[in-house]
Amino acid sequence: MKQLLQNLRTGEATVAEVPVPIVQPGRVLVRTAASLISAGTERALTELGQKNLLGKARERPELIGKVWEKVKTEGISQALEGVRDKLDQSHAVGYSAAGVVIETSPDVTEFRAGDRVACAGTDYASHAEIISVPRNLCVRLPDALSFEAAAFGTVGAIALQGVRLAEPTLGESVVVIGLGLVGQLTVQLLKANGCRVFGVDIDEARIQLARELGAEGGCVPASAKEQILAWSRGRGADACIITAATATNEPIELAGEISRLKGRVVAVGLVGMNVPRNVYYQRELTLKVSLSYGPGRHDPEYEEHGHDYPLAYVRWTEGRNIEAFLDLIASAQINVKQLVTHRFPIEDAPSAYKLISGSTNEKYLAVLLTYDVDGEVGRQVENPVVTKKAAAAAGRVGIGLIGAGGYAQKMLLPNFKAAGVEFCSIASASGVSARDVGTKYGFAHFVSDAQSVIADEQANLIVIATRHGSHAALTVQALDRGKHVFVEKPLALNDAELDCVIAAAERSAGELLVGFNRRFSPLAARAKEVFQHRQAPLSIVYRVNAGRIPREHWTQNPNEGGGRIIGEVCHFIDLMQFLTGAAPTSVFAQAVGGGQGNVISEDSVFINLQFADGSNGVIAYLAEGDASLQKEHIEIYGEGKTFVIEDFRSARLYAGGREKKESLRQQDKGQADETRLACAVVAEGKPAPITLAELEATTRATFRIRDSLRTGQPMEVMIQSPKSKVQSPKSN
C-alpha cells in the first residue's frame, strides 16, 4: 500500500510502498478515504529534519544526556552511528483521517466492516491507504457527513478541547490569538457556543476569513490592545485562546494585556511560555495549557488498551470530543469546506509537503490528501534489489525477523550481517519499520504479519524481537514448523506459556535459542576460566543500577512486558547459572519498599538464589540510583579469589594478594558471539549453546521471584524438561 513517510535526518517526504498493517488486538483496520495535513505539526517536523545535527540537538536538548551516556559505554563512534541510524529512519506522519472499516479485531464489537469512521492519533491515523487504529480513537460518522469533512475530526477536537478549558459562557467576549486552521475552527466553536469572538493574526486574509466565519472583529497584534479594549466595552476579554504557533513570547504577553481582571487564558498552540508574572498576578489570570484532543491523550490504557473513561466522571474524552465536533459539522454549525485550500492525491503528497514547508509563496490553510478507495493494495512488499533465492539449503542461514525495533536494529541485525547470513523476510506490525529496516539490510520480503515470516521457506532461523507478550506464542508456532528459533528474552511470561514452549521445543526438529547474551561476553568467559578448576561453591554479588521505568511503559504492563523481573532479571540469573554451572534451586526476594506515585516497589529488589552445587547469588536490582553510576557490577568469590566485572567493559582479578586489571576497548555484553554461535547451530548442526533445561531454569526462577515477593517466603525452582540437563561444575 502507499504511505507518506518522512525522513527525520533530511526532512524529506516520500510516498513509499509498505506492507498493509495487521489487525492487532483492540484495533480496527480502516481503508482511508481522506486525511488532513496538520500544517503546524507536520511543518515543524520538516523544519527539524532540515537542520544539521547540532541544530537538532538544540531543538531536542533532552536527548544530549542520553547520547553522552552511550558515548561513555559504547564509545563515540558507535554512539554517533546510533544517532545517525535513528535519524535516518522513516516516520509515519499524519494523525487525522477518515475512511471505511474493512476488518476488526475479534475483541472489537462496537465496529464492523463497512462502518464509516473518523480516526485519530499519531502512528495510527497516518497518511496511508490502510491504517490500523485503536478502538477508542475511532468514531462512527453521522450519516450525511463526507469523508473530507470527517478528516477534520482530530484537528477539530484540538480546537474543541481548548474551548472547553476556557469554559466560555453564553455572551462572553473571547479572543482567539492565531487564526490558522485550529484558530479558524476555534472561532466557529465559540460562535456556536453563543460567544462574541475577536480574532488576532499577522495575516489580514486570515482575519477576513475569521470575520466571514463568525468573528465580530479582528486585527493584527500591533493594534490589538486598543481595538479589543473598545470591542469589549472597556472590560477586556473574558477569555483568550492562543492557537498561534511561534517560539516567541508575544502571544502569551498579549493575552495578559487584553484580559480582564480574573480572566482565563488557554494555550493550545506551541508558543513561548515565559509568563509575564506582573500582569498575570495583578489581574489574577488563570492560565491553562490544553492537552491535544482531550482526556485520554498519551494514556496507553485509553489509547492502546481500549479502556474508556466512565462518561459520568469524564464526560469529554478525546474520542467523545471528536464525536461532538463531527456532530457540529453535520448540523452545519461548523464550516470546514471554506477552510480547504488544497487537495492532493496520496501519490502527490510530497507536493503538499513542499507547500506547507514554505518553499513556495503560495498561501494555504487546510490541505487534504485523497485516496482511491477501490484500488488494489498488496499486503507484502518485495525488495526489487534482492534476487529471489531457492528454498533454504544445508549450510546456509536464512533469517526471518519478526519485530524491527531498536534492539533488533542496533544489536541483532549488525551481528547477524557480520556472520554472513541471508536476510529473507521481515515483519513489523505497522509495516513502516519492516520496509525501512528491510531495505537497509537487504531483506527479500517486507510484511506486517508474523505468520508470513514463519512460513517463508527460505528462512530457517526465525528471530523473534517483538514485545515480550508475544514471544512464547510465536516461538511455539515457529518450532512447530520445524524452524530454528532465536527469541529475545524473556522466553515466556508465565508457567503456562513456558510449558507450551518446552513441549514445542522437545517435539521440534528445530533448536531453541534465547537472547541471554551476557554469558557470551569475553569477561564472563574470563571469569569462568578463573574458577574452572574449583571444588567449592561460588558466591556472586550482582548489583544492577537499573534506573526508573514509568508505570505506563509497555514493559511494566503484565500482558505486554511482564514487568522488569521477568523481562530483565532473567539476564542476571542466566549469567549466574553459567558461572556456577548449576541450576537455581530456590529463590527468596524482598522489595526495597512500597512504591509511591510513579515508582513500582518491585523495580527495586534484593534477590537471594541458591544453586544445585551449593553456590549462592545475590542480585541487587535497584531502580532509584543515579544514571552516572555504571549499570552492572559483579563480584565473584571462590577459593581465595575474587573476580570483579565492571559493566562488561573492564575487570579485576584479586588472587595471591595481587590485583590484575584488564579492559576491553568498548563494552561487550556478548551479542556478537551469541549470534555467531546461533548461526553455527543452524549452519553446522552444532548443539544449542544454552541447553533447554538451562533456559527453563532461568525462566522459572523469575516466576518464583515474583511468587516470593507476593508471599514473603522462599520458593523452590522446579525444572520439568527431561530433554537436557544443566552441566555440573566438575564437567567445566
Per-range role (PLM):
Residues 21-37, 45-122, 683:
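Glycine-rich beta-strand-centered segment in the early N-terminal region that forms part
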Residues 116, 123, 148-223:
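Mid-domain Rossmann-like dinucleotide-binding core that forms the NAD(H)/NADP(H) cofactor-binding site
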Residues 268-286, 290, 296, 491-511:
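Rossmann-fold NAD(P)-binding glycine/threonine-rich loop
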Residues 285, 295-313, 329, 511, ...:
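Predominantly a Rossmann-like dinucleotide-binding segment in NAD(P)-dependent oxidoreductases
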Residues 351-354, 359-373, 377-381, 567, ...:
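Contiguous beta-strand/loop segments that form the cofactor/metal-binding neighborhood of enzyme cores
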Residues 378-441, 461:
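N-terminal Rossmann-like dinucleotide-binding module
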